[in-house]
Amino acid sequence: MAKKDKKTLPPSGAGLVRYFEEETKGPKLTPEQVVVMSIILAVFCLVLRFSG
């Protein structure tokens, strides 16, 4: 059998997008801020529901 030459890509990323390097627009929120805002929204909805 003949030995096949295996061609490998260089270990540079091979065209993959690195999302953590992409600059995004919009507010930067921590997980704690998201949880607090969700709780506030839920309480606000309950107040509106039962207030009349």
From Swiss-Prot:
<comment type="similarity">
    <text>Belongs to the SEC61-beta family.</text>
</comment>
<dbReference type="GO" id="GO:0005886">
    <property type="term" value="C:plasma membrane"/>
</dbReference>
<comment type="function">
    <text>Involved in protein export. The function of the beta subunit is unknown, but it may be involved in stabilization of the trimeric complex.</text>
</comment>
<comment type="subunit">
    <text>Component of the protein translocase complex. Heterotrimer consisting of alpha (SecY), beta (SecG) and gamma (SecE) subunits. Can form oligomers of the heterotrimer.</text>
</comment>
<dbReference type="GO" id="GO:0015031">
    <property type="term" value="P:protein transport"/>
</dbReference>
<keyword id="KW-0472">Membrane</keyword>
<keyword id="KW-1133">Transmembrane helix</keyword>
<feature type="topological domain" description="Extracellular">
    <location>
        <begin position="51"/>
        <end position="52"/>
    </location>
</feature>
<keyword id="KW-0653">Protein transport</keyword>
<dbReference type="Pfam" id="PF03911">
    <property type="entry name" value="Sec61_beta"/>
</dbReference>
<keyword id="KW-1003">Cell membrane</keyword>
<dbReference type="InterPro" id="IPR023531">
    <property type="entry name" value="Preprot_translocase_SecG"/>
</dbReference>
<feature type="topological domain" description="Cytoplasmic">
    <location>
        <begin position="1"/>
        <end position="30"/>
    </location>
</feature>
<keyword id="KW-0812">Transmembrane</keyword>
<keyword id="KW-0811">Translocation</keyword>
<feature type="transmembrane region" description="Helical">
    <location>
        <begin position="31"/>
        <end position="50"/>
    </location>
</feature>
<protein>
    <recommendedName>
        <fullName>Preprotein translocase subunit SecG</fullName>
    </recommendedName>
</protein>
<keyword id="KW-0813">Transport</keyword>
<dbReference type="InterPro" id="IPR016482">
    <property type="entry name" value="SecG/Sec61-beta/Sbh"/>
</dbReference>
